[in-house]
């Protein structure tokens, strides 16, 4: 059981910016104290991610190789069939994953056979004993309600960056539309998975601003993925330099302090980190990782590598329990 922690929804930009710029050891100590109080036991959730609909997206997100506006090697592919998706979910469950996330490269959910297939996938994933998460762009109230009825655990819809930096990253969807999507998901009774990306040319103040938006949601998102840009050839951000790994550690730590009971998920860009940097992220409060060899269209550490990482860090994950059963 987690201890009582102080949950705030009134964080100021100045407070968050000061945390991001505080001495690293002080920041890690504070994040550790919050994490131990709110989430004792160091249990790490393992989430597997599959691209159901790859490429051909109408959005122009500057970081994304799936956009039809860019010239990456990713091309539009047909949707995966329900059986193929559930077969992959079964493999993920057998490998020890807790959550199965499914992605559609869409601007918004489309009514019709594709949506009915999505609902079938959600039901099938839940029947396997896994949490089910979907990311597919904007949605209507009725679509959110039908997903909830199908058993959807979480809907992912990231903010990507701060309101101030947003227009330099995407022009085909407004920040307000993102916030409205989050509200529809919440009203349907589905939990939120919402975070962002660093390394896209934003300032420290932008990072603080994005975290402020997240931390002032009431309630906080249940899952907060922290991503580092994976610069892909053919996208507008292809030449963006890699971030210092300690910048990602700082983002994880501040997210943990601001949102004590949320799952802080170490997400895209993790493959660029060495083992020690990943363990620092776990120490800073990350309590979930994407587990499996790929994330949509980018690579991810191998399963055996992640098992070795978690063992070295001394943290528990569901595959430990499976092995002991």
From Swiss-Prot:
Radical SAM core domain: residues covered: 42-270
Listed GO MF terms: 2 iron, 2 sulfur cluster binding; 4 iron, 4 sulfur cluster binding; biotin synthase activity; iron ion binding
SMART domains: BATS (SM00876), Elp3 (SM00729)
Cofactor needs: [4Fe-4S] cluster; [2Fe-2S] cluster
InterPro entries cross-referenced by the UniProt entry: Aldolase_TIM (IPR013785), BATS_dom (IPR010722), Biotin_synth/BioAB (IPR002684), Biotin_synthase (IPR024177), Elp3/MiaA/NifB-like_rSAM (IPR006638), rSAM (IPR007197)
Keyword Glycoprotein attributed: no
Provenance organism: Synechococcus sp. (strain WH7803)
Protein residues bound to [4Fe-4S] cluster: 57, 61, 64
Binding site for [2Fe-2S] cluster: 101, 133, 193, 265
Name of the protein in its database record: Biotin synthase
